Amino acid sequence: MTPDYFNFLLTGKKFNEYTNASTTQLLNLKTSVWDYDILKLLNIPKDIFQTILQPSTSIGYLKHSIKEKIGFDLEVIAAPSHDTASAVLSAPSYDENYFLYLSSGTWSLLGTEIDNYNSSLKSLELNLTNEGGYNRKYRYLKNIMGLWIVQNIKKELNDKYSFKDLCDMASKANNKYIIIDVNDEVFLSPNS
């Protein structure tokens, strides 16, 4: 993954960071390492995968060639390289046992952190997922619509209007009580 490649360029060491690796659906939930049975089933060679490294673990120090160019050395630490994992880690919380978050962008992620994964049938039916978090926690979450719709409306209007313009037009609409279920499955694979 891209963050792992940057760490390799800095240190010359190959690892896969846990939070990002967890989003591949190729990690074993129980062991938090690559699931070689799934890889074999999918005919994916296991030798392209590296050891899983937890965030905040030292990867090592800069390669000699980089140290010579910049004139100093520094230790490279694995960050939670999945953007939502970093966002959740940085979010303020008064009580880590009762913590909800909404991380919004093109897509939004609504969830909490839990100590043990939840792979129940009910979770599957509700389309909830378990992604790796900091300190071996799980980000138990649901992907929901974020700004994707308004980004695509803007694009389909050839960027003629700013986001502010679109919001102003929507607020002046005659019928302000139209409800669009932005999480309807029709938006998951649109033609536009």
What is the role of each PLM region?
Residues 19-21, 46, 135:
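Short glycine-enriched loop/turn motifs at secondary-structure junctions
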Residues 3, 7-28, 51-54, 59-60:
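Short beta-strand-loop/turn "lid" adjacent to the catalytic site in phosphate-handling enzymes
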Residues 1, 8-13, 26-28, 32, ...:
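Active-site core segments that coordinate phosphate-bearing ligands/cofactors
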Residues 36-56:
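A conserved helix-loop-beta module that forms one wall/lid of the active-site cleft
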